[in-house]
Swiss-Prot record:
Gene Ontology molecular function, alphabetical: methionyl-tRNA formyltransferase activity
Species this chain originates from: Saccharomyces cerevisiae (strain ATCC 204508 / S288c) (Baker's yeast)
GO biological process: conversion of methionyl-tRNA to N-formyl-methionyl-tRNA
Taxonomic superkingdom: Eukaryota
The name this protein goes by in its record: Methionyl-tRNA formyltransferase, mitochondrial
Transit peptide location on this chain: 1-26
Amino acid sequence: MVKMRRITPTRLLFTCRYISNNASPPVQPLNVLFFGSDTFSNFSLQALNELRQNNGSCGIVDNIQVVTRSPKWCGRQKSILKYPPIFDMAEKLQLPRPITCDTKQEMLALSKLTPSRQGNPENDGSGAPFNAIIAVSFGKLIPGDLIRAVPLALNVHPSLLPRHKGSAPIQRALLEGDTYTGVTIQTLHPDRFDHGAIVAQTEPLAIATMLSKGRVNDSTADFNSEGLPRRTAILMDQLGALGAQLLGQTLRERLYLPQNRVQAPTAYKPSYAHRITTEDKRIHWARDSAAELLNKLETLGPLHAFKEATAARKDAQNSVLKRILFHECKVMRDARLDNGSKPGMFKYDDIKDCILVTCRGNLLLCVSRLQFEGFAVERAGQFMARLRKRCGALSEKLVFL
């Protein structure tokens, strides 16, 4: 069971006043519209399904209908149709096929659905309606009219709210060097992301401890097809498992009801976890230390810088910038380039088969696998051997920009 602090019923009345404009949260079994998409969502969906399977003894969850985003074409020439990981989990749990919703209109249409006994949602108005929404890493704002149409609307968020509101709480916690993080169960605000009332929250959890545990040995890990960077994948697993426990506890103990006690919100400093952009993955050699770049790589995935190259066309400008992706790196703590080396300068170490790049503080980043724009990922030695052909005379200028 996840540790939670308790508060007085008076405080609870304040935190639970969000739920519906004229209705109390349901105590009858829940027919849940589950909004999710990624690996973090899988854990909560499993916990919810366990409550559904144990319905005879506890009567908490009756039906689950997964709602997710449409699959996307990706890969070279958009040749691969990639489904959100929640699709595979729903199939594994033998739940109805997920409904895909990408627009406000598509989501509002869900208010007409009712779960059928066969497990396929119907819109004929028969049967008990969906009476709960649970959103876990869905990625879109659920319309207020849909939220207000159900008595209960909850969200599982991987941070200690109000710290790291927004779409990238796990990545921002890692990038900003947070010592602790956690999971929050909050209500769904009808108009804004992460502005609901806190229903339950874990104690602060040491990030270093969670990272040391590695991936969760759970069937949800089988469905991590997202190719996440190491640190993000570990923290997503660890927080996903804890969030699932907290969600199960919240529903079993009905912590959302005014007469029940919930965890007291702690006064964490508010912050916003902005969506990860291409600029976040840009290397600034004079600003970033080698350790910071390694943390970025293991949090965001391949980073990029640029290499100046001679223009191939005679009528073009004298030089062009080619994007370089850095895929595999480590920090060299006991090595330095020449005394006159400046951030971004590099040389090849043939013994280690790596490219040594000077970073802020004059420490070196050892790059073993990287990728020149328009070419495949390659070892450092291959990159250096082909640099002349790709950059022309400017290959002699051993500087990443």
